[in-house]
């Protein structure tokens, strides 16, 4: 099986460092949805070494800054990854989603990433 992130040559890279790169997601949840992807093929964030994790943090902060400069309406972010098929991972190459959020982009954002299990999202009203 081929890996989309390893085999693709037509990616528009926004920023890169020695360990990973950032691209705009072609199936965005919100405008400017960005993916951070390691060059080394590993399935999960949990397979990264410390240098790669540090590089992720640096690129994540840099991309956050860039996004805030591009769109003054961004008022928050969701940051996350899916690890394993049962967690929703469909591309078995580690990648982190940086999803810009704007006031009013959904009716009730309460619970954020807890929404992966919709019944558990609004934990204060359970």
Would you name each region that the model predicts?
Residues 1-126:
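HIT superfamily nucleotide-processing domains
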């Amino acid at each position: 099986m081929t890996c989309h992130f390893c085999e693709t040559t037509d990616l528009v890279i926004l920023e890169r460092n020695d360990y990973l790169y950032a691209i705009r997601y072609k199936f965005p949840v919100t405008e400017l949805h960005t993916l951070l992807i390691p060059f080394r093929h590993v399935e999960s964030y949990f397979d990264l070494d410390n240098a790669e994790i540090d590089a992720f943090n640096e690129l994540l902060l840099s991309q956050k800054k860039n996004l805030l400069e591009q769109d003054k309406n961004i008022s928050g972010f969701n940051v996350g990854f899916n690890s394993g098929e049962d967690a929703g991972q469909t591309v078995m190459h580690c990648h982190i989603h940086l999803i810009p959020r704007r006031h009013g982009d959904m009716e009730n954002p309460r619970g954020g990433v807890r929404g992966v299990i919709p019944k558990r999202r609004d934990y204060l009203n359970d």
